[in-house]
């Protein structure tokens, strides 16, 4: 059973729109949006690509686990997670137990388009030469984990972040009728 319905966590692959939708959710609910990758960068003073290069994926995942633990202790937040947050069992447990988990999905083509628009240097697991294959590989591993955690699922290929954020809030209130009372 959920211990805290005041937090909204956005999970899904890179390029699914977690930060865009999270920004709109934050505006609509007058809450702070946290992006776990950006919070790691703030704490370390280094970008994610550098952390991957210097510490490897294991070092980054350790930092991510520490950040998720800290953020899950907060109340009334919107959290856009990194795509790989679901790889760690402790992350999955903390996120699932402390808020409503929204899984945003996107086709591989949509992901490629969005990642290309933002630039890939910030995304260490996105490799230009075989990017489509890499995204498919990541999806095969992560999709079952996203699905297992999700309270609500939304495709974002035809994304209008504000409309989707509004629909998410309506669905949360309908699914968890006490949600509105707990956020006051």
Swiss-Prot record:
Highest rank taxon of the organism: Bacteria
Keywords per UniProt: Amino-acid biosynthesis, Aromatic amino acid biosynthesis, ATP-binding, Cytoplasm, Kinase, Magnesium, Metal-binding, Nucleotide-binding, Transferase
Free-text comment on the cofactor: Binds 1 Mg(2+) ion per subunit.
Subcellular location: Cytoplasm
Chain sites annotated for binding substrate: 37, 61, 83, 142
EC number(s) given by UniProt: 2.7.1.71
UniProt: Mg(2+) binding residues: 19
Pathway it works in: Metabolic intermediate biosynthesis; chorismate biosynthesis; chorismate from D-erythrose 4-phosphate and phosphoenolpyruvate: step 5/7
Recorded GO CC terms: cytosol
GO biological process: amino acid biosynthetic process; aromatic amino acid family biosynthetic process; chorismate biosynthetic process
Keyword Cell membrane: no
Ligand binding (ATP): 15-20, 123
Disulphide bridges: none
Residues forming coiled coils: none
Cofactor needs: Mg(2+)
Catalyzed reactions: shikimate + ATP = 3-phosphoshikimate + ADP + H(+)
Main location per the UniProt record: cytoplasm
A GO molecular-function annotation: ATP binding
Keyword set includes Ligase: no
Assembly mode: Monomer.
Role: Catalyzes the specific phosphorylation of the 3-hydroxyl group of shikimic acid using ATP as a cosubstrate.
Family affiliation: Belongs to the shikimate kinase family.
Protein name: Shikimate kinase
